[in-house]
């Protein structure tokens, strides 16, 4: 009986020291810990997002071989930008892609052939400079995108000035060749006849795929072309060297090429949104807005989905990376551990002005995070 009384006294003493157990207090402490963890994760993601944006600026300038962003005003862009239908369609295409809120399938369609449009503007030619009577236009240099892919379409676009009365226009495209013994410096490419009504000028396209393919096979034969568009009175209506008020009406080439696929499938990574509570390495959405940067020199896209990686790389989830796991096991204090980083990236196509106020179309590699992982 005395032993039982002693146990009761001890039990009551322990309750007095420990105090009452408040279940609500324990729940609040647990909730505070969870909230603190979520806040830390949000802060970590925000830092990763800011770092990604700054890295994108540096990467674009570096990959375009630009020391600084070209300083071109919006007014200058309006004057220099070609006002032709295919370029407008290309810009509209970027707008459609931008407005599409869906991120597409998680599976890359690298198996199917993709078609790309390349807009090539005329440049200076040493041969044209040597010709005594300066021809009316045009020399085109071709990027590696055109040289190393299959050309499926090539259109020369020219702008015809408006006429005051109905007239028939005879359009002639001539290819420059090295002077022959009889003095001939041209050979015909295409000719066509079209009727024009009074009013605004028109854009006219001419198929030059065969000529372009010959130039690609024999680059030394590419000496330039001459463009003529004579009305019934012998007036040339073709804009070859734009006069004041004709900005953006230069001739140009629209070339469509097929890009050969390299892979068919890829494995998957985690995709999250900004409200996700996922702690593991994950891909998060990030939209880059070039207008917010003040980068008006980028014609298209004005914004694009770049994405970024954030999250923890716990060794519990590293069955896929046995080498990293073994290194950590051998020297846990000396190894920094894996980081959440892009494991697959894809390019973006871009229309932009370079430092010489020339319009360039190019593909910039490694600008979109497609997948994140621990490595």
Swiss-Prot record:
Q: Which UniProt keywords apply?
A: Cleavage on pair of basic residues, Cytokine, Disulfide bond, Glycoprotein, Growth factor, Heparin-binding, Secreted, Signal
Propeptide residue range(s):
19-266
Keyword field contains Secreted: yes
Where would you find this protein in the cell? Answer: Secreted
Q: What kind of modification does the protein receive after translation? A: Synthesized as large precursor molecule that undergoes proteolytic cleavage to generate an N-terminal propeptide and a disulfide linked C-terminal dimer, which is the biologically active molecule. The circulating form consists of a latent complex of the C-terminal dimer and other proteins, including its propeptide, which maintain the C-terminal dimer in a latent, inactive state. Ligand activation requires additional cleavage of the prodomain by a tolloid-like metalloproteinase.
InterPro entries associated with the record = Cystine-knot_cytokine (IPR029034), TGF-b_C (IPR001839), TGF-b_propeptide (IPR001111), TGF-beta-rel (IPR015615), TGFb_CS (IPR017948)
Instruction: List the Gene Ontology MF annotations in alphabetical order.
Output: cytokine activity; growth factor activity; heparin binding; identical protein binding
Give the GO cellular component terms, alphabetically: extracellular space
GO biological process: what's one of them?
Answer: myoblast migration involved in skeletal muscle regeneration
Q: Which residues bear the site annotation Cleavage?
A: 98-99
- Pfam families documented for this protein: TGF_beta, TGFb_propeptide
Coiled coil ranges (UniProt) are none
Report the leader peptide range. Answer: 1-18
Q: Which residues are glycosylated?
A: 48, 71
Cystine bridges: 272-282, 281-340, 309-372, 313-374
Q: How does it assemble?
A: Homodimer; disulfide-linked. Interacts with WFIKKN2, leading to inhibit its activity. Interacts with FSTL3.
| Family under the similarity heading | Belongs to the TGF-beta family.
Q: What does this protein do?
A: Acts specifically as a negative regulator of skeletal muscle growth.
Q: What is this protein called?
A: Growth/differentiation factor 8
Source organism of the structure:
Sylvicapra grimmia (Grey duiker)
């Amino acid at each position: 009986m005395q032993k039982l009384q002693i146990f009761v006294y001890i039990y009551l003493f322990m309750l007095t020291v420990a105090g009452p157990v408040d279940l609500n207090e324990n729940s609040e402490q647990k909730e505070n810990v969870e909230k603190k963890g979520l806040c830390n994760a949000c802060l970590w993601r925000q830092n990763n997002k800011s770092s990604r944006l700054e890295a994108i600026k540096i990467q674009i300038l570096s990959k375009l071989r630009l020391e600084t962003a070209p300083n071109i005003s919006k007014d200058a862009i309006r004057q220099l930008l070609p006002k032709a239908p295919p370029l407008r369609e290309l810009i509209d295409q970027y707008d459609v892609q931008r407005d599409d809120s869906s991120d597409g399938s998680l599976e890359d369609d690298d198996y199917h052939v993709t078609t790309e449009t390349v807009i090539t503007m005329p440049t200076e030619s040493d041969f044209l400079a040597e010709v005594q009577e300066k021809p009316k236009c045009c020399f085109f240099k071709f990027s590696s995108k055109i040289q190393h892919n299959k050309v499926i379409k090539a259109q020369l676009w020219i702008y015809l000035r408006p006429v005051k009365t109905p007239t028939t226009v005879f359009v002639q495209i001539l290819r420059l060749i090295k002077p022959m013994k009889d003095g001939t410096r041209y050979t015909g490419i295409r000719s066509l006849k079209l009727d024009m009504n009074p009013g605004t000028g028109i854009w006219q396209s001419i198929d030059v795929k065969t000529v372009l393919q010959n130039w690609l096979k024999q680059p030394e034969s590419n000496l330039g072309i001459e463009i003529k568009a004579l009305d019934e009175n012998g007036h040339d209506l073709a804009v070859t060297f734009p006069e004041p008020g004709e900005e953006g009406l230069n001739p140009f080439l629209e070339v469509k090429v097929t890009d050969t696929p390299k892979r068919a499938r890829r494995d998957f990574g985690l995709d999250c949104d900004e409200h996700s509570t996922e702690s593991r390495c994950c891909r998060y959405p990030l939209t880059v807005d070039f207008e917010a940067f003040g980068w008006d020199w980028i014609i298209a896209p004005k914004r694009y989905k770049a994405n970024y990686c954030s999250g923890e790389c716990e060794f519990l989830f590293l069955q896929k990376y046995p080498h990293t796991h073994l290194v950590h096991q051998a020297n846990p204090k000396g190894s920094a551990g894996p980081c959440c980083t892009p494991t697959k990236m894809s390019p973006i196509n871009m229309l932009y002005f370079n430092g010489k106020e020339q319009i360039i179309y190019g593909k910039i590699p490694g600008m979109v995070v497609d997948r994140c992982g621990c490595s």
